[in-house]
């Protein structure tokens, strides 16, 4: 299995041999969907809350008399039928959204994503990405020269200059291999992997 090795202008300078176990797997759509949903669910804080009719602040006074008004009878304004009343089935903060995925499935799913990105031409390898200063403009110009508008960079080591330069770019994400996640891999149009990160990805997902 070979991937394109890009130069600083985003052009294919050569080809690089990469492990089939990570970049040459068959795509399993059901498995990828499962790990993406699990990742998003596990990222939820689970702090949303609404009030039922017993929790909203209200008066216990009857809004209007029982008979003679032509309206449907009403006991108090906390009823879910009234604006400002409680919810019938409120969301509670003790809900558990956790989805469990075992390590073998997660590794297989991540490898399937990397393999599909390689087949679609959305995955490329660069020697390294080093900056002399933490200037966002320098990194933005670098990606512009490579014709990259939406890019995720997986670098073997993210130094302070690279981190500071990338954090203010909306469509750029720079992470180390251990922080690569399925949602970001699927979302970005291009994924750049530094040469030094290939071995780390193989250790994690092979």
UniProtKB/Swiss-Prot annotation:
Family matches, as HAMAP family: Ribosomal_uL4_B (MF_01328_B)
Gene3D superfamilies in the cross-refs: 3.40.1370.10
Composition bias, Basic residues: 56-65
Record text on subunit structure and interactions: Part of the 50S ribosomal subunit.
Biological process terms in GO annotation: translation
Family: Belongs to the universal ribosomal protein uL4 family.
Pfam families: Ribosomal_L4 (PF00573)
Signal sequence region: none
Function comment: One of the primary rRNA binding proteins, this protein initially binds near the 5'-end of the 23S rRNA. It is important during the early stages of 50S assembly. It makes multiple contacts with different domains of the 23S rRNA in the assembled 50S subunit and ribosome.
Stored InterPro entries: Ribosomal_uL4, Ribosomal_uL4-like, Ribosomal_uL4_dom_sf
Name of the protein in its database record: Large ribosomal subunit protein uL4
Alphabetized UniProt keyword annotations: Ribonucleoprotein, Ribosomal protein, RNA-binding, rRNA-binding
Gene Ontology cellular component annotations, sorted alphabetically: ribonucleoprotein complex; ribosome
Highest taxon listed in the record's lineage: Bacteria
Molecular function via GO: rRNA binding; structural constituent of ribosome
Region feature (Disordered): 44-77
Gene this chain is encoded by: rplD
């Amino acid at each position: 299995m070979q991937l394109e090795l890009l130069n600083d202008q985003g052009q294919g300078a050569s080809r690089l041999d990469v492990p089939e176990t990570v970049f040459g797997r068959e795509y399993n759509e059901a498995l990828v969907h499962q790990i993406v949903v699990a990742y998003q669910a596990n990222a939820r804080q689970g702090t949303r809350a609404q009030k039922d009719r017993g929790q909203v602040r209200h008066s216990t006074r009857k809004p209007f008399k029982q008979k003679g008004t032509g309206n449907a009878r009403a006991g108090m304004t906390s009823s879910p039928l009234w604006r400002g009343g409680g919810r019938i089935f409120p969301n509670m903060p003790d809900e558990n959204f956790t989805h469990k995925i075992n390590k073998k499935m997660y590794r297989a799913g991540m490898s399937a994503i990397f393999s599909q990105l390689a087949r679609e031409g959305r995955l490329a390898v660069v020697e390294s990405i080093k900056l002399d200063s933490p200037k966002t403009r320098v990194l933005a110009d670098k990606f512009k020269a490579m014709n990259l508008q939406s890019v995720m960079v997986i670098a073997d080591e993210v130094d302070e200059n690279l981190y500071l330069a990338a954090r203010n770019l909306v469509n750029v994400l720079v992470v180390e291999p251990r922080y690569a996640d399925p949602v970001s891999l699927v979302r970005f149009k291009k994924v750049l992997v530094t040469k030094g990160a290939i071995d780390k990805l193989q250790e994690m997902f092979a």
